[in-house]
Amino acid sequence: MKTSIIKRNLKTIGKTWFIFMGSIFSALSVILSFISWEDIGISKTCNKILGYIIIIVVTLIVAIIWICVFKQENTIWENGSGKIAVRYDDIMKIAFPKKYKKNKIVVIPVNTCFDTQVDEDIAKCDKPLVSPKTIHGRWIKNMIASGISKEDIDSCIDEYMNFKGINPIKTLSNTEKSRGKIKCYENGTIVVLEGQNGITYFLMALSEFDENNKAQSSKESIVECLKKLLDFYDGNGQGFEIFITLMGTGLSRSGMSHEEALQTIKSVFQLYSDSIHGEFNIIIYHKDKGKVSIFD
């Protein structure tokens, strides 16, 4: 177990430790009201003290293991049918289940052009487009692996745009963008695609590619996108459970840390909680436990 994970959760470990320890000592006091230490063969004071120390140490170890290993979800707000929870998981496993369990919505942050070209062999392309390491890129690769071609994805996106009357805010020239799609849509634009086994994808325009096809976003634009997501979900979510990853970290270049990204999402969701009539899950990649705590 990494020490960084323990450090991130010290406050919660401490609270849990006191709860566990209090419960054990309360139970012990009840037991000792019926029998004495001597009845169970403990008569020396040093042995009694040792017994208390063992309880303290064991409950601390149990608290650390419980919080850092087994506790994977933390509910931060709940009211009626509305709920906001933070959990460790892999958004791709949620987005591509092997069998149907229940209807779910998975939010996939994409660029404002809704590009679907994932460039892995950077030696053979000028100004690579979607990185395979982003949620956007991983989603496209998983879609293709599940039997849906890039052309089919493009077709579904275009059909939804036409059906909803969503128009681009600008069209780039070949000089501005030599590869990929050239129609740019407003930040926060959402395209709905049906997946398999009860999964619906909300593709949300979050980052804008610059002249070198590098994704760019800001904290302010992310906040606006989150507001639009809540409004869109209120009218189109059908109360389905929804999953969203941390936005603004990594290759989106907003400059936010994992902790700042989590606090931003939590703040927006709690501020506009009147729009939440379903279960909202903020997903932190399980390998990022050392970077941010679900209890922050």
Task: List each model region and its residues.
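Macrodomain-like recognition of ADP-ribose-binding/processing modules
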Residues: 1-296
